């Protein structure tokens, strides 16, 4: 237990919380260019081929981000918008690509939960 004079001299040190999406630099989204588009397998109890892309952001960071939805048109040099949000069964994937913006087209034939996949309202 510190004395009052010790607290006057030093003060308490603030506990710093770790950022969940450091590459965004406090922004809600960031733009970037795909450097590699590939599939990867998830952690132990799950089995699939998850679509991910390595993205070089406008602030110089290079991050791995998940491509949500069924089917995509992304390839190398595609310009995408990324948001925060990790994928629990893919280690190191802490970002999602926003569908329906820039070069990432929305999911075709999507009827429910359309806003998350950039799908237009079916007429």
Curated annotation (Swiss-Prot):
Residues recorded as bearing 3-methylthioaspartic acid in the entry: 89
SUPFAM superfamilies given in the database record: Nucleic acid-binding proteins
Biological-process GO terms, alphabetical: translation
Keywords per UniProt: Methylation, Ribonucleoprotein, Ribosomal protein, RNA-binding, rRNA-binding, tRNA-binding
GO cellular component: small ribosomal subunit
Regions crossing the membrane: none
CDD domains per record: Ribosomal_S12
Cross-referenced PROSITE patterns: RIBOSOMAL_S12
GO MF entry, a single one: structural constituent of ribosome
Function: With S4 and S5 plays an important role in translational accuracy.
Similarity comment: Belongs to the universal ribosomal protein uS12 family.
Subunit structure: Part of the 30S ribosomal subunit. Contacts proteins S8 and S17. May interact with IF1 in the 30S initiation complex.
Protein name: Small ribosomal subunit protein uS12
Source organism of this protein record: Anaeromyxobacter sp. (strain Fw109-5)
Lineage: Bacteria, Pseudomonadati, Myxococcota, Myxococcia, Myxococcales
